[in-house]
Amino acid sequence: MHYLDISFTYKNTDISVREKLAFDSDEKKEQILKLINSNKNIKESMVLNTCNRVEIIASVEDVKAATAHIIRCMSIFSGVFEDELYERADIYENSGAAHHLFAVASSLDSLVVGETQIVGQLKNAFKFAYDNNSCGEDISKIIHYACKCAAKVRNETQISKNPISVSSVAVAKAKEIFGTLEGKTAIVVGAGEMGELAAKHLISSGAEVIIINRSSERVEQLVDSLGDNASWDSILKLKEYVNNYDLIFSSTAAPHAIITGEIIEPREFHRYFFDIAVPRDIDLLNTELISVYTVDSLEEIVRKNLALREEQAQKAYSIVGQDTSEFLKTLKEDMSVPLIKSIRKQAEICAKNELEKAIKKGYLKHSDYDEAQKLIHQVFKAFLHQPTMKLKGLADEERASELSNGVKFLFDIKDEQNFQAGDIDEI
C-alpha cells in the first residue's frame, strides 16, 4: 500500500482552473469518489475541496497507475486536459504525502498561514468520504495523525494567535482602501462559513452588515447571533444592493457567477467587490469605478501575514517533520505486525503440539506441563527477537516486499492475521 496526494492549490493553479476542478456539491463529490474508487489500483480515496485547494488523498497499490487514473477522472469532471492537470499538479507519495498533509492540516500550506478553518474542512472531507464508503483504515490512520499534528502545532506555537482567514484578509484590504470601516454599511452575499466570518470581521471593525441570502432560516439565526449591527434581506433584492452600496463581499455556494454585468447599473461612486467564493460569484471586469478582488488577488496582505509568522512557521514545520517521522515509524511497524504475529502464532502451535505428544508418550508429567510451556515460550521468544526486529525494519528496505514474501514462503504463511501494533508485546 502507498499513500498518494494529488494537489491543486493557489500555488500551482490559478482560480480560473481551480473553479473548474471544484467539487462544490455533495453530489459531485460522491460521483468523483465513485469514479476514482472504480479502479483496482485505488484502495481508498477522499477529496479535500476549499477555496484555495482541491486535493485527492488516496491509498493505492501502484502509484503511477493510480495517478494516471485520478488525473483522468479529474479531467473528465472538469473539462481540463490531462496534460495541463499533470503540469499543474503537485504529486506526493508516501512520506511526502504524509508531510504535505500534516502541513496542510496545520495551516502551513494555506494562503493565509495560521488560519484555523482548514483542519475542520479536512475532518468534514474525511467524514464525507467515510460515510460514502470511499475510505477506511488507511486514510483514517493518516487523517488521525494529521489532525493530531495540527493540534500540536496550534498548542506549541503561536502560529494561530489572532487567527485570520481569507475573509479577514478581505476585510483588512477593505480597511486599507477606506482608511476605516467605522459607520460604513457592507453587503455580504451568502450566509455560509466564509460569509459569517466576513460579517464578524466587518462588525468588529465598526461596520454595519446586511446579509443577502437565498434561505431565510440560516440567515435569521446568523443575524441573531451577530447582534444589532447585522440585518438581512432576500437574494431577490441582490440587484438593488449591488447598485446602491460601495462595499460588497460575496461567498455563496452557487455553481456559477451571481453578480454579472447584466445586473450592474452605472453609478457615479466607486464600488469595491470582494469575491471570496470558489467557483467565483462575481463576473465583472475592473473599470474606473468598479474594483473586483478575488481570493488570488489578496497576496500583498498575505505576504505581510507570512512575514509576521515566519518564526512560528519554522517551529511548526519542525513539529510536522517530527510527527511525519513518528507516523512513518508507526506505519512501518503496523505493516509488519500481521507477519510477526503469524510467525509467533505458528511457533506457539508447534510448541503446544510437541508438549501434548510428550505427555501422551510419558516423556513429560502432566504436573510439569505449565512449567514446560513457560520455558518453551521463553525459548522461542528469545529465538524470535532478532527476526522480529528485522521484520519491523523492513519498511526502510528497498526490497521490503520481496523479503517479506520470502519470510512467508519459508514459514509457509498463507494468510496473515489482521492485528494492530498494540497486539505485539515488546520482545
UniProtKB/Swiss-Prot annotation:
One Gene Ontology MF term:
glutamyl-tRNA reductase activity
Catalyses which reaction? (S)-4-amino-5-oxopentanoate + tRNA(Glu) + NADP(+) = L-glutamyl-tRNA(Glu) + NADPH + H(+)
Gene3D superfamilies, alphabetized: Glutamyl-tRNA reductase, N-terminal domain, NAD(P)-binding Rossmann-like Domain
The chain's coiled-coil residues are none
Sorted keywords for this record are: NADP, Oxidoreductase, Porphyrin biosynthesis
Q: Which residues are listed for substrate binding in this entry?
A: 50-53, 110, 115-117, 121
Q: Which domain of life is it from?
A: Bacteria
What positions constitute the catalytic site?
A: 51 (nucleophile)
GO BP terms, alphabetized: protoporphyrinogen IX biosynthetic process from glutamate
Q: Where is this site: Important for activity?
A: 100
Q: Which pathway does it take part in?
A: Porphyrin-containing compound metabolism; protoporphyrin-IX biosynthesis; 5-aminolevulinate from L-glutamyl-tRNA(Glu): step 1/2
Positions of NADP(+) binding:
190-195
Q: What is its EC number?
A: 1.2.1.70
Q: What does this protein do?
A: Catalyzes the NADPH-dependent reduction of glutamyl-tRNA(Glu) to glutamate 1-semialdehyde (GSA).
Return the domain comment text from this UniProt entry.
Answer: Possesses an unusual extended V-shaped dimeric structure with each monomer consisting of three distinct domains arranged along a curved 'spinal' alpha-helix. The N-terminal catalytic domain specifically recognizes the glutamate moiety of the substrate. The second domain is the NADPH-binding domain, and the third C-terminal domain is responsible for dimerization.
Q: How does it assemble?
A: Homodimer.
Q: Which PANTHER family match?
A: GLUTAMYL-TRNA REDUCTASE (PTHR43013:SF1)
What protein family is recorded? Answer: Belongs to the glutamyl-tRNA reductase family.
Q: What else is known?
A: During catalysis, the active site Cys acts as a nucleophile attacking the alpha-carbonyl group of tRNA-bound glutamate with the formation of a thioester intermediate between enzyme and glutamate, and the concomitant release of tRNA(Glu). The thioester intermediate is finally reduced by direct hydride transfer from NADPH, to form the product GSA.
The name of this protein is Glutamyl-tRNA reductase
State the encoding gene. hemA
